[in-house]
Amino acid sequence: MNRTLKASVLGLAAAGLMTSSALAELSGDLRIISDMSNPAPRAVMESLAAEFGEMHPDLNIELEIVDREAWKTQIRNALSANPPDVVNWYAANRMLPYVNANLFMDITDWWDAGDYDGLESVRGALTIDDRQYGVPYTYYQWGVYYREDIFNELGLSEPATWEEELANCQVIVDSGRACYTIGTKFLWTAGGWFDYLNMRTNGFDHHMALARGELSWTEDEGVRQTFANWRQLIDMGAFVDDHQSYSWQEALPFFTDGEATAYLMGNFAVAAMRDSGLSDDQIDFYQFPVITAGLPQGEDAPTDTFHVPSGAQNVEAAREFLKFVTSADVQTRINNGDNLGQLPVNANSGIDADEFLEQGFEMLSGNAQGGIAQFFDRDFPAEMASVGMEGLQEFMVFPDNLDEILERLEDARERIYN
């Protein structure tokens, strides 16, 4: 697939889009392998390649789009044998195997040179050992979505602190409702709860150190305090019963029907909430409350990325392409509701007129000073994430098993990281 691809989907040639990338005289071949295989992302990727090609008429762009799931097993071979110039992947610890194998290029100098203005809030998610290895192009927020109408009925306000959270929850439980719906049949939802409780209890840096295997599950007092805070909610009946039997979608009717008043979830759930019949007047959003005062707040915002393989042949063109896709105007267009329908990572971008996207953008751009986490099953190595999330689900059902759970997680840590 070459540079003659049409850019009709995004209209990226609109006035004002000709960034500094257009000034570079690029030639040769630029090979891109992308996993943006679903219909809307595919159209975005094809249009990006087409527009970049129009900006650089002497550059031949070869775009290969592969199945998103298949790419997870193919990427190592692609990076090792005849690597392309640009690939899609994910941020944080999902980069680590390819950084450690010297398969992703260190692009710290490009970050330091100012190529990525407006991306400083997520620089940490592209950093390993103080070096940067990629750039982000889209993400979405997590947080607490709640039934505003029920909060109003009960006289509740959005909680800013853990004490306010617990007080609210007691009022909700006393009204005959659960504070939170959740479905842990697929374990990742429990991982989201641990992410937030641990980041709010101990801080983003502690959470990332745990993800890297640097802290003991059994000996670190901060980890135990996280579970103690979680147990406060469990013991007061904050969560719906039998959540281990439900997927996140199957748990949504508790929220829709008013049997539970809130859902800790990613912004992708809003469409399902609206489709269930709830109006925007009935739903609102707040940032997960502060637990330990003074800690900069970290947030879960799973981030998709572009990287330059270490064996790239056209590094100059790859650099310009990364600068292009992270520019504020391009990020605005590719993330709007007609395309990816997510959040631009560039703080200078604009967003669609949607209250939840607006709140998420404001939170991630201006109130996530602690750092951007990628989610439990992305930040922890795959095997550790699997064992860990099994333990987290078990804790939510059988909190008295905590010591046994932590012993298993510690055994896994010693085996997996060492």
Q: At which residue positions do the language-model features occur?
A:
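Extracytoplasmic/periplasmic solute-binding protein
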Residues: 129, 133-137, 142, 166-215, ...
